[in-house]
């Protein structure tokens, strides 16, 4: 996918990996970058606008845990304004296994609902122009960090959902791939709670391992966007971008 002159919606593109990715996207010259986030960040938005004045950067408040109908209403506002959207990036995520319901609501249900909502506008069966979904999942969707099983399970679910959406492309026309960062130096990793406090030092222990910066992750994210491979499972770890070959253990046969 060519980022230049495209219209992109980025959910949670104002912090951590998201903000650095927004910076890299803006440098590539999209026509519009629409940021949907729960918390406004005027300084970051001003920075993005200044980084490339030719790009129209807009912000809408959005909590991914709202009902599906509210998400559809917001997307209608955006589509009415832009007419077309080329790429949806779902990046909302929390890491706190003390908040079980919210972890699942943000990391999985919110991603599912936002993707489902945009199909109203993209699905070729409804005469839609189709589009691309990039879902930020996690390497914990491959193998869990067992001290944070709720977070890991939510990311595994998001990965499975994304893979299914990709396989439905021949029906809907909508393609999808997953972005799976490894341990990255973000606010999420600085301090978080393990499930039932089984490991109070889990954040500290993770950061003792080799990590990557948010900028390294963002630069590889943009490479994945440009590659635009339907069904790709991208691992963004240690400053590298690698496509994962998923081992098939079972097949429904349908």
From Swiss-Prot:
<dbReference type="InterPro" id="IPR020904">
    <property type="entry name" value="Sc_DH/Rdtase_CS"/>
</dbReference>
<dbReference type="Pfam" id="PF00106">
    <property type="entry name" value="adh_short"/>
</dbReference>
<dbReference type="GO" id="GO:0004022">
    <property type="term" value="F:alcohol dehydrogenase (NAD+) activity"/>
</dbReference>
<dbReference type="InterPro" id="IPR002347">
    <property type="entry name" value="SDR_fam"/>
</dbReference>
<feature type="binding site">
    <location>
        <position position="138"/>
    </location>
    <ligand>
        <name>substrate</name>
    </ligand>
</feature>
<dbReference type="GO" id="GO:0006066">
    <property type="term" value="P:alcohol metabolic process"/>
</dbReference>
<keyword id="KW-0520">NAD</keyword>
<keyword id="KW-0560">Oxidoreductase</keyword>
<protein>
    <recommendedName>
        <fullName>Alcohol dehydrogenase</fullName>
        <ecNumber>1.1.1.1</ecNumber>
    </recommendedName>
</protein>
<dbReference type="InterPro" id="IPR002425">
    <property type="entry name" value="ADH_Drosophila-type"/>
</dbReference>
<dbReference type="InterPro" id="IPR036291">
    <property type="entry name" value="NAD(P)-bd_dom_sf"/>
</dbReference>
<comment type="similarity">
    <text>Belongs to the short-chain dehydrogenases/reductases (SDR) family.</text>
</comment>
<dbReference type="GO" id="GO:0005737">
    <property type="term" value="C:cytoplasm"/>
</dbReference>
<feature type="binding site">
    <location>
        <begin position="10"/>
        <end position="33"/>
    </location>
    <ligand>
        <name>NAD(+)</name>
    </ligand>
</feature>
<comment type="subunit">
    <text>Homodimer.</text>
</comment>
<feature type="active site" description="Proton acceptor">
    <location>
        <position position="151"/>
    </location>
</feature>
């Amino acid at each position: 996918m060519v980022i230049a002159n495209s219209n992109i919606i980025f959910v949670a593109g104002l912090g951590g990996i998201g903000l650095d990715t927004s910076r890299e996207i803006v440098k590539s010259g999209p026509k519009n970058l629409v940021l949907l986030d729960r918390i406004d960040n005027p300084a970051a938005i001003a920075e993005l606008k200044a980084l490339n004045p030719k790009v129209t950067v807009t912000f809408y408040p959005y909590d991914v845990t709202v009902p599906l109908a509210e998400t559809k209403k917001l997307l209608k506002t955006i589509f009415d304004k832009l007419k077309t959207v080329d790429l949806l990036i779902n990046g909302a995520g929390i890491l706190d296994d003390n908040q079980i319901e919210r972890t699942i609501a943000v990391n999985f249900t919110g991603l599912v609902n936002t993707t489902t909502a945009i199909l109203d506008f993209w699905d070729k069966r409804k005469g839609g122009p189709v589009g691309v979904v990039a879902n930020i999942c996690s390497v914990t969707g491959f193998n869990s960090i067992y001290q944070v099983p709720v977070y890991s399970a939510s990311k595994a679910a998001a990965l499975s959902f994304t893979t299914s959406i990709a396989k439905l492309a021949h029906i809907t026309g909508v393609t999808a791939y997953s972005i799976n960062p490894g341990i990255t130096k973000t606010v999420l990793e600085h301090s978080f709670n393990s499930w039932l406090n089984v490991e109070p030092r889990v954040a500290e222990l993770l950061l003792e391992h080799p990590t990557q910066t948010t900028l390294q992750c963002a630069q590889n994210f943009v490479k994945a966007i440009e590659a635009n491979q339907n069904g790709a499972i991208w691992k963004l770890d240690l400053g590298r971008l690698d496509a994962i070959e998923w081992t098939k253990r079972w097949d429904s046969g349908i």
